Amino acid sequence: MAHEVVVVGGGIGGLTAAALLAARGVNVCLLEKESRGGGCAVTFERFGYTFEAGASLYASWQPEEIHARIFAELPVEQPEVRQAAPAYVVRLPDKTDVAVTGSVEEFAETLRAAFPECADAAVNFYREIAPVGEALRRIVRRVPDLRTASFSRRMRASLPEARVARRVLAALNHTAAQHLAKTSTRFRRFIDVQLQIFGQRESNECAYLYATVALMLPLWGMYAIRGGASGLADTLTEAIKKSGGSLRFNAPVLRLAYDEAGRALGVDLLSGERVEATRAVISNLTVWDTYGKLVGASRTPDNARRRIKDLGGWGAYLLYMGLDEEAAQRLPAEHLLTLTDWQEGQSFNPEGAQFMFGAAPEWDTRAPAGKRAVTVSTFTEAEQWFSYHEDESEHEEQDQRTLELWWERMHAIMPELGSGVEMIETASPRTFYSYTRRKLGMVGGIGQSPDVFGLNSLTHRTEIPNLFMVGDTVFPGQGVAGVTQSALIVANEIAPLSKG
């Protein structure tokens, strides 16, 4: 069977690319090994609860942002979203709560109260990043494919931002820490936990320009989606169907198929069937799995092999819980980003010090009456979950130890919970691997350090003719909004919208 475009993988990136192409009249077929779309963002049900697989906060749902741009093309309404107020609260080890919300000037008063030891430096840091982040946001609106756009297109997009252009150019290779010199350890850790959750790098490693956008996201507005990320995935699935696209679930792909010139001409399924693509194949796998599994080690170009050899990401260990409504009302926000240890005198290590507590919103509890679904997200080194074990009982013991550790930390930093929370289930990198087949179950993309950020990032293009990539390991990177933008970039390259 032949199509113009074949999409491998039904994560948010693959679904968005397929939905856009189908809406533009392209004969597209999406292949997904699971029974529904969503990838590592899919929700799951247990005992009357519907759990999200991550932090459950989503950026860029404002009218002029990426999601509105996508749904303006699609034959369906976007899922219901509501802004979280505040976006979240950062809770520090001394029990200081910092509500991240409001305009920069409104937030300045919050910073002064929370960080009196370096109030002016903290406020000045945010006043410094705000115009840079806003400028980068506007530039990417004008040129979504900034990473691969021509020099002239980049310049035209940047001209209206002349006031901050010099600052942007001067900071291209800076880390966020280089702009925190006069701040306290308390404030730096406040920044570290946010950069870690949004960019998988703390301030000493995170690209400054990435930080200017990431730290402004909650002030611009973060949103909850009805039904979680699966609400978005299901809506995109409906859009593909309405536009005449083909969806094939429970259809695992084995490898890429090539013509005599080495161009991608389709894919071979595990069943032995070949699905041909006359224009392009789009991989919604990670960059490691695109080359390691889809392309194949023997056909992976040397440049690509060298580039991805030392790239890595974090794994996630998640706790899925039920929360009494009475306990939920005692919390300062539905999302708490918590720091449990200052880790003074050492480099920041998120594995032992931070977690995100995310409760389903009151208007979409995803739980039995009087309850709310909760996902607690923590960082973990993925590889340790795949190291040699004598038998499965050792994995179970590792899971139990990790659960007990985070359960104790959670109750210590969030005493409001009391007995109003119960454990339902856990997930480790092994869980994510079993469902998504992502390398080592790593989720969240590649850490946004200067060497892999922006113009140094991996692009949607590959060295295999007719093969493209979407997802969180290519430009622009992390988050549902970033993945969605990567899909728009690929759709625009394969089937650009007519300017007429």
Indicate residue ranges for each PLM-predicted region.
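A conserved beta-strand/loop element that lines the FAD pocket in flavoprotein oxidoreductases
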Residues: 240-253
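A glycine-rich dinucleotide-binding beta-alpha-beta segment and adjacent secondary-structure elements
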Residues: 186-201, 215, 415-476
